[in-house]
């Protein structure tokens, strides 16, 4: 089964770092002519003295290069999500800057420009962050009755849910081991952790699940689990299989011999046992019929009873001879 390959952040650095300052993108901006990206402040400062791309030397604009620069929010969100602590550190630097320079007018800027956006509002999750989750047993019958009213739920169903606080780097494999040890589930049963009705991979982390299913922190991360028997694999003994194949071949050979003997009375030469020589029906004229390789053949001598046709066979091929 195909598995997602995890790569190191250092392998992605060439796509996440600005060539002008050597750091990760902050307020990423892209040149629409060549699609190369830089930090906004870096490219604006560079284009004050040049009208060409720093990477490929394509002309950005003849007179006003800033017109062909666009803010790349998607790229910036990717950088913030891939680099741990970058968003939180950048927001802190902006707050410190405006606190140290109160004369700077930031009223026209957004909350992110002023550094007043929290990780929760930006939906940025770090590895060391604590995530609240709920885990409950997945009942297929209850899922089929999903259209019923909420008031029909019993107190037992509400008490089935448990709440945990776990690091964002916790994997589903660790959560399955926790459930097995907590509930004493035997090893011959399989535990599946699910989001809604979809089973989750063992290598998924809570951070992966939050990003994949767009968890918005409006409550604990809802997870479910189910327990099912482990499927046993039947092992085939190669020695037994070889014996069965050999016996099948022998049966097919014997069947072909029987079919040959019934189809027209032609003696078969494929049998492993030699057939006895066929004696001449005329003991006084032994030259009429002779045996070659267990089959009958006619002699070249003249037969006194030539007026009667006889049937002979040579090497399993029948023929009618008139003598």
Curated annotation (Swiss-Prot):
Coiled coil: none annotated. It is found in: Nucleus. One of its GO terms (cellular component) is PcG protein complex. GO terms for biological process: negative regulation of gene expression, epigenetic; negative regulation of transcription by RNA polymerase II. A zinc finger (RING-type) spans 18-57. It comes from the Eukaryota. Disulfide bonds: none annotated. Residues 287-301 have a biased composition (Low complexity). Component of a Polycomb group (PcG) multiprotein PRC1-like complex, a complex class required to maintain the transcriptionally repressive state of many genes, including Hox genes, throughout development. PcG PRC1 complex acts via chromatin remodeling and modification of histones; it mediates monoubiquitination of histone H2A 'Lys-119', rendering chromatin heritably changed in its expressibility. In the PRC1 complex, it is required to stimulate the E3 ubiquitin-protein ligase activity of rnf2. Component of a PRC1-like complex. Interacts with cbx4. This is Polycomb complex protein BMI-1-B.
